[in-house]
Amino acid sequence: MLHLKIFKTILVFLIFISCESVDDSSKWISLFDGKSLDGWEMKIAGYELNDNHKNTFRVGDGTIKVTYEDYDLFDENFGHIFYTDKKFKNYHLKLDYRFYGEHVNSFTNENDAWNYKNSGVMLHSEHPNQMLIDQGFPVSIEGQFLGGSGVNDRPTLNMCSPGTEVDINGTQAMQHCVNSTSKTIHSEEWVSVEFLVYSDSIVHHIIDKDTVMSYSNIRYGGTYLSENFIDKVGDPLKEGYISLQSEGHPIEFKNIRVKELD
């Protein structure tokens, strides 16, 4: 009889865990169906909304691809592809990314490698239809993705702040980009990353279950602030859209999913 009670207890526990798992997984929203760009809009600096200049953004092999096959030069053609079906405020974002191939030389210097393995995800982005024609970056917070060349340290999941300001350890970050504490990823392997975003209060960047960057008090201001938001300097940035960046190096994105938090 005792064994039967123990068995029943274990069975109930396993059923509970199973239900919890199902309930949790059902809260995740997939932003990319692996087949199309339904729900996404793109904006490339110098071009109108949804003008996919030189077919920069494509779908293939179940991924969103940023490609530069048709480019001879990267002439500040900063691009972003936005999930515009929904704004997000408090959320947990997960995605995988992978750099591949060679970057496109910048028009400033054929040997300028600043955009080598350089991309990112923009959090709390403005809507792309608000962006000016030549605007390089949406007002947002960037989780910057960088990759190494096999030589020097180059952490990923850094924080950049186009049109925004943040505090790190209670002090305003004075640099536009601040390095995380992550390791350098030199290969072209897939990298799984996470972001925990709590409105304007705090954001955490996570890789391999390790929090490598945290910042708080997200607000409008700083460099790259669009003239559309000048009157908002100092105001909290509480919510926005999610966008992926094209900055001169081929990259793929997949498994892009969000769970909204209370």
PLM region spans:
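Bacterial Sec-dependent N-terminal signal peptides
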Residues: M1-S26
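Carbohydrate-interacting regions of secretory-pathway proteins
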Residues: C19-D262
